[in-house]
Design a protein with these regions (language model features):
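Periplasmic/extracellular, small/polar-rich flexible segments of pilin-like filament-forming proteins
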Residues: 2-3, 62-148
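N-terminal single-pass transmembrane signal-anchor helix
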Residues: 10-38
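Short, charged low-complexity linear motifs
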Residues: 18-28, 48-52, 56-58, 128
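Membrane-proximal N-terminal amphipathic helix
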Residues: 42-70
Length: 148
């Protein structure tokens, strides 16, 4: 024979639907705030691939010039310079005394363009939407707002 205890229910376990929905809403709100910040952080982390490589190539060009009194034929311009995952590099020798090295973003870094000349003049040719160019444009933009 089964007997029941009058008026006593077993305590319920688990979550109600409304509790789960509130938790999902909070997680979605936090993700909507965190993901754009994370993307900006990753983008800022990829910019040094361009600036460091341009600086290295510029030093190689100057070393070549010291030995040969000309930039024509410098290894910084003749070697394969497309070695970065996020940037394509190129070199233009205008005269024996002048060159321009440039880096153009690709993939997730599309929209970025940096350059440096034999006079060590650095410039940012382009930035993606949401970023700004500095005024005057004599540096490499590394953060949103035209910050160099």
């Amino acid at each position: 024979m089964h007997t029941r205890t009058a008026g006593r229910q077993a305590p319920s376990r688990g979550f109600t639907l409304i509790e789960v929905m509130i938790t999902v809403a909070i997680v979605a709100l936090l993700a909507s705030i965190a993901l754009p910040s994370y993307r900006d952080y990753v983008t800022r982390g990829n910019v040094p691939q361009a600036t460091a490589r341009l600086s290295t190539l510029s030093v190689q060009m100057e070393q070549y010039f010291q030995d040969n009194r000309s930039y024509v034929g410098a290894p910084g311009c003749t070697a394969d310079t497309t070695t970065s995952k996020h940037f394509d590099f190129s070199c233009t020798v205008q005269t024996a005394q002048a060159f321009t090295l440039s880096a153009v973003g690709k993939g997730s870094m599309a929209g970025f363009s940096y350059a440096i000349t034999q006079s060590n003049v650095r410039s940012t040719g382009a930035v993606p939407t949401g970023w700004a160019l500095p005024d005057p444009n004599t540096c490499w933009v590394t953060k949103k707002g035209g910050v160099c």
